[in-house]
Regions:
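Short acidic/glycine-rich loops and adjacent helix/strand connectors
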Residues: 1-320
């Protein structure tokens, strides 16, 4: 890489997506970076497109690349820069100039979207991550095929360990699909489901240990998650509520809460076994090790609290 400015753009540029309002990427962003030619990279500006467009989570595609570059030129002008000052653009197939940034990770057989999540938590609030032991977990629902066409043929979730100044990358499991399918099934966002799980005391226990032999590494997770959530929900919804159930909540809300309590426990079980395996494999000491997590599921409060209380890691790097 030569010194100068670079753009990473997590956007969509497609006429059909724009006209039909097809949403393939949410929370679209553009980042401006500066590389000094040595070892230092600086984030100059970070533009969340929802703050420009007013669209919450901005999933709207640009009509075409011309529309994108018109906006980019306007944004760069604010920094006294132009398109001619940009060495390279990454992150969106229709506009990126090269894919060299992915070459380092090509042999991992892990979707790059997950690798990107992992690297973001690795450097979150820590410009020198190689100075201490660290566990990295990219806990997301799925990859991004918008710029990596074979993403769905790879392992979905990236894990990593930094030890003795070296980074080792490997595939891990993520329970995020359990939550994304629950969102679709119950028509409630993941945060609402988390809150509802603890809002009432209603508990209808399901033997989640029966799922211990099911793995959650790749595209097969989509079908597995649906079957698991449906099975738990069928059991719970066919059960009677306790007589002292809180009358402020409907029967449906009580039963969704009971379903999600089981999903919370299963999610913790999945992440826990991955963390235990990593600690054992790399002979790590939790109170001397940083836990770094990113991806949509890394915002799962019940699981995060469980991990923090159980392992007492040295520190935590979890981007909001």
């Amino acid at each position: 890489m030569k010194s100068g400015y670079y753009i990473s753009a997590f956007v969509c540029c497609n006429e059909l997506q724009n006209i039909l309002d097809i949403k393939l990427r949410h929370d679209q962003t553009i980042a401006l970076w500066y590389f000094d030619g040595d070892k230092n990279v600086k984030l100059v500006r970070y533009w969340e497109l929802e703050r420009i467009s007013g669209y919450k989570q901005h999933p709207k595609a640009f009509f075409d690349t011309k529309a994108f570059f018109e906006l980019l030129q306007t944004l760069l002008h604010q920094e006294n820069l132009s398109l001619d000052d940009i060495n390279d653009i990454w992150g969106t197939k229709e506009i990126e100039k090269s894919t060299e940034y992915r070459d380092f990770f090509a042999n991992t057989n892990i979707a790059f979207h997950s690798i990107a999540h992992m690297m973001s938590c690795m450097y979150y609030g820590n410009s020198q991550p190689f100075g201490t032991d660290m566990i990295l977990l990219s806990l997301d629902a799925g990859p991004d095929s918008q710029f990596e066409e074979d993403a769905y043929n790879k392992n979905f979730y990236a894990g990593g360990v930094i030890k003795n100044g070296e980074l080792d990358i490997f595939s891990i499991e993520s329970p995020a699909r359990l939550w994304s399918y629950s969102f679709k099934k119950f028509k409630l966002r993941e945060g609402t489901l988390m809150a509802l799980a603890t809002a009432v005391d209603t508990q209808i226990d399901f033997d989640i240990s029966k799922f211990d032999n099911i793995s959650f590494f790749d595209d097969s997770t989509r079908i597995k998650a649906r079957k698991i959530v449906d099975e738990i929900a069928d059991f719970v919804f066919s059960s009677e509520l306790p007589e002292n159930a809180d009358k402020r909540f409907s029967e449906e809300e009580h039963k969704i809460s009971a379903v999600m309590k089981n999903i919370v426990n299963l999610s913790q079980r999945i992440v826990e076994r991955n963390v235990d395996n990593i600690i054992k494999r790399y002979n790590l000491v939790p109170n001397k090790t940083i836990l770094a997590m990113a991806g949509g599921f890394a915002l799962n409060c019940p699981t995060n609290s469980y991990l923090l209380q159980k392992y007492r890691f040295k520190d935590y790097q979890i981007p909001p």
